Amino acid sequence: MKKGAVERNFRKIKNQIPQIEEIVQHTKTNALWEHEVSVRKKIRHLKEFENDGLRDFKSVYEQYLEILEYISERLVDEYNRKNGTNFSFKEIVKHNYDSYLGSGIISVLITKHIPKLVSKEFDNVFPANPKDEYEHARKLIRKFYLHLGETNTGKTYNAMQRLKQAKKGVYLSPLRILALENYERLNSEGVKCSLMTGEEEIIVEGAQHISCTIEKLDVNEEYDIVIIDEIQMINDDQRGAAWTRALLGLNCKEIHICGAINSKELLIDIIEDCQDQYEFKEYKRSIPLVMEYGSFSRKSIQDGDALVVFSKKRVLELAYYYGSLGIKASLIYGDLPPEVRRKQYEQFINKETKILVTTDAIGMGVNLPIRRIIFMNVKKFDGSQVRFLNSQEVKQIAGRAGRKGIYDIGYVASYGGTQEFINEMINVRDRTIEEAVIGPSEVILKIKSLPLREKLALWSTREEKMYFYRKMDISEYIIVLDKIKGYKLDEKTEWTLLKIPFDVSNPTMMDAFLTYVDELFIAHSDVISKPTCLIKDLNELELYYQKINLYYSFSKIFNLEFDEQWVYDERMVVSEDINKILLNI
């Protein structure tokens, strides 16, 4: 990273100290978990600047350590109060300081009173090398075809041509909308294909192909050909384990991997460690990408432009602004249901709308006829802090500009004098992805000496022996387990509840989730209640859509009777309502 970018990031982290101190001092102890995770991430981020000669580095780093210590002491006090113990912060971190910074005080605390027997159980259940969890795959000599390169270069298209020739194949997607798109494409081209995502299942009679979100992969099933899309997600702290599981566990002799070039070295390391074979093909743009060096003016908008911002609020603000000028826009952002995204895409493709206003959700998914990508901002909130975009993010978004046969040159512009930064990010070499994220598998339930929460915490602190793997962030698992602790459920049920996809950080969704836990395990109901929506504004409708998905996922995972047709019909009604609101902006 260039020195200017380093200094900007450092200054941003430094300036956040007073606000963070104020917040944690006035936060109830049981709500400190998210702050603890966020502060540890900032400490790790600061550590990267250690040798950059920054003034005040030592002082800022020590202040963050003091904040973490304050939070950790309160968490230990709360643990002692709940469990009748008398652990001290200093005792816990005395010989475990690196683990404390890496996984948090409570995770380290739990390892202090784990007997050696339990450690041996972990060794027996979890092999030293994650690849050895997948015995079926290790008996095969698999061949990987690496389709790696820039955005919008036909990587997935070429792999799909091969998939169509298979007797039995799977397309593994990062997004429901991509799984849906390829499910429809295969069926329209005469290849019978079923659809499986966390939100729906459409089983086509006689189909031997499946298009699914990657978390739905059955690694015990045999396939002829598989496509793993957007492989760079293997480095994602929350979801990356699903890509690693597919890479290591697929029971398939021909596997096509599509994604960014900066994953190449890691993939080769893992493939060679599995004693499998590979071929590599790099993809480069056939359509040139041209940077505009004049700062973009909002009045200079043109047909086919896509304006990129990093919050739903900014998407709506810009859409209202251009709507007031008589310029209709399609809108794309993370909370938008896939059905609505699709309608918005179609309106843009069919020129019913002139421009696109979008978040970085556009970086993955459908290729659109975009003439020019315009960065209206160069910072985003990543879940823990507001930071500058990295080079891979800029390239992924900028690469959406240009469409063969429609726009034979793709243009990139930016707002607010940020052209140099965008140009630098486009031309700089991406940071190499060095680690694949791994998650705990269900075999953890075989360990009987500890509750599931403590086992997961211990798992997260155990050092990986292979240098190209790291543990996933289990903080969401811990939050859910803390919320359901009072129900006294068996571990198998707890594990199943952890696999239900919903926004754990959203209090309304957590309340809906706990209501279903109540209905099933306290009231012992055979069915759970359908969600309702009384206020039909944009935010409430989007939340209602998420509740419908939760109703579906909860019912499906526990094999409950539920009104599946109502789910599909109600989703369509909600999507229509949302789309009407967006059309009137």
What are the residue ranges of the model-derived segments?
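Conserved interdomain hinge at the start of the Helicase C-terminal
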Residues: 157-163, 238, 242, 249, ...
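Conserved strand-helix element at the start of the C-terminal RecA-like helicase core
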Residues: 167-182, 256-258, 264, 299-325, ...
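Walker A/P-loop
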Residues: 139-158
